[in-house]
Regions:
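A conserved beta-strand element that flanks and buttresses the S-adenosyl-L-methionine
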Residues: 97
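S-adenosyl-L-methionine-dependent methyltransferase catalytic module, highlighting the catalytic core
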Residues: 4-7, 12, 106-114, 124-190
Length: 191
């Protein structure tokens, strides 16, 4: 599975510039952390914006983590096994960022239960995901189901504000804020 993700990262330009403004603003607005986890952090583009004393960037792609090392030489880098428990102790982080990750995860219940486990009580979970809603339905009508929901696409899940809120609530998180900006759903929740 890691090979698949490494092949995807090979298609991403090495210097793709800064992250989109709405994501930068969202991450910069998160509370400072003692220990932060950028889960699915890829090349570390957003991890550079986290105010944390200690930063861990974890991803399934070794190629992405090599890029993250160049951006974040002081961060702990951890390669993950897909759909496996996270290799961190219970209640280890006070902030977990999952930026554009949930839509790619096979077992979202395992993933979020593991996030909850490694997050300390009252710790912060920050989630971003592409927004889907009525416009997605119109796009399906206009362009066709198969084209919109390509079975070879790395995207497995299509979330709306409401479905993300329900998912986080069902997994034991308290949603603190939920917004939609520039085609993204942005959520902050507490354990």
């Amino acid at each position: 599975m890691s090979r698949y993700h490494d092949e995807l990262w090979a298609l991403v330009p090495g210097d793709r510039g800064p992250a989109p403004r709405h994501l930068l603003d969202f991450v910069r607005g998160l509370p400072p952390a003692r220990r932060a986890l950028d889960l699915g952090g890829g090349d570390g583009r957003l991890g550079t914006e986290l105010a944390a004393d200690e930063l861990t960037v974890a991803d399934v792609s070794a190629a992405a983590l090599e890029r993250a090392h160049g951006r974040l030489p002081g961060a702990h880098l951890v390669q993950l096994e897909p759909d496996a428990p996270l290799p961190f102790p219970d209640s280890h982080f006070d902030l977990v960022l999952c930026a554009n990750v949930l839509e790619h995860v096979h077992d979202v219940q395992l993933f979020l239960s593991e996030v909850r486990r490694v997050l300390e009580p009252r710790g912060t979970l920050a989630v971003t995901t592409p927004a889907h809603g009525r416009l997605t339905g119109l796009d399906v009508l206009a362009r066709g189901f198969e084209r919109r929901f390509d079975p070879l696409s790395p995207q497995l899940r299509f979330l709306t504000r409401r479905s993300l809120a329900r998912l986080l609530d069902a997994m034991g998180f308290e949603v603190v804020s939920l917004s939609r900006r520039a085609g993204a759903v942005l959520a902050v929740a507490r354990r």
